[in-house]
Regions:
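Conserved beta-loop-beta/alpha segment of the NTase-like Rossmann-fold superfamily
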Residues: 79-198
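Short, surface-exposed linear patches
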Residues: 27-31, 48-49, 71-75, 116-120, ...
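Catalytic core and acceptor-binding pocket of nucleotide-sugar-dependent glycosyltransferases
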Residues: 199-207
């Protein structure tokens, strides 16, 4: 069965050095931070992309990135006669933070956990056969050459091993906003860890 890699882009509770509350900081000409993350997830081979944001920001973010993206790997295969027919669309879903969690579960890490749980829960309600087996987390403010993501696409989608981008031998574990992958079991462990740092006792059911 084909791996369902779900891309998670946390925006809620994101802290930046800029006054702009949206991840619209330009990283290139006509290319914003949120667009970078969407492109990165598509390049990594994600089957779906889930953007976690507060209700008031979702309409603005949706206007910027839309409802779907193309998988860049399949977008322009010029060696194929009918390459346009083989283009793959990656649906984008928007996940609001529950009002009860605001100002209580207010860490950036919780936005990631909430996005993963929402992706699992929504998929499971449709069919257990489309539940994500792995998650790719992309931080809008984590800047690097996203073109190199394609080189590691196979490793990123490995069912058995997690993948971490590094900078000077440091990863997200060192509080750097660098992309990484995790499984459902990793999700459970991280959720318990983050829960210890928050005031709210309620936990959503385990996937």
């Amino acid at each position: 069965m084909r791996l369902h890699l779900a891309g998670i882009i946390p925006i809620a509770n994101m802290k930046t050095d800029h006054e702009n509350p949206l991840p619209e900081v330009p990283v290139d000409n006509g290319f914003s931070a949120i667009q970078k993350s969407v492109y990165e997830c598509a390049m990594a081979g994600c089957s779906t992309i889930w953007i976690v944001a507060n209700d008031d920001l979702i309409p603005l973010v949706r206007k910027t990135v839309g409802e779907w993206a193309y998988d860049p790997v399949y977008y322009a295969r010029n060696y194929s006669k009918f390459y346009k027919e083989h283009r793959k669309e990656v649906p984008i879903y928007y996940v609001p933070i529950h009002p009860k969690d605001r100002d209580r579960r207010d860490s950036y890490g919780w936005s990631v956990i909430h996005g993963i749980h929402s992706a699992w829960r929504t998929s499971y309600r449709l069919s257990q056969w489309i539940v994500p087996q792995k998650y790719y987390i992309s931080f809008p403010m984590g800047l690097f050459d996203v073109g190199q993501v394609r080189e590691y696409r196979k490793e990123i989608k490995d069912k058995e091993k997690n993948f971490f981008f590094t900078h000077e031998n440091k990863t997200v574990k060192d509080d750097l906003p660098l992309s990484f992958t995790m499984t459902g079991e990793d999700f459970k462990l991280c959720r318990r860890h983050i829960n210890k740092k928050t005031s709210k006792e309620y936990l959503p059911p385990l996937p």
